[in-house]
């Protein structure tokens, strides 16, 4: 029996002007997700998906490249302004926000939503190198 050819659908341009940018910055990687106001994902990128491997994923430069990549995809979807929600203690927090501004997306709000424990779980021990 002949194999059927899959038809790929081109992504339709959604004219969504406002959005929310979620930046999760860990010590090992940085993830950027741009959603509409309901929370549906328009574009996403990470340092690992941008071609960085190993310890280079945790660098500010990798976060900058990932943010630019996600922002370009979101601009194609019609995003013009966004709120930024930053989560995590990583190195790529500020550089990801600056990269978003450099692409031309207007940032209306920057909010840090990193969960802070009221003396909950014991943190990992300090590294001795």
Swiss-Prot record:
GO biological process, one term: translation
Gene that this polypeptide is encoded by: rps11
Main subcellular localisation: plastid
GO cellular component, as recorded: chloroplast; ribonucleoprotein complex; ribosome
Protein's name in the database: Small ribosomal subunit protein uS11c
Top-rank taxon: Eukaryota
Protein family (similarity comment): Belongs to the universal ribosomal protein uS11 family.
HAMAP family: Ribosomal_uS11 (MF_01310)
Compartments, record wording: Plastid, Chloroplast
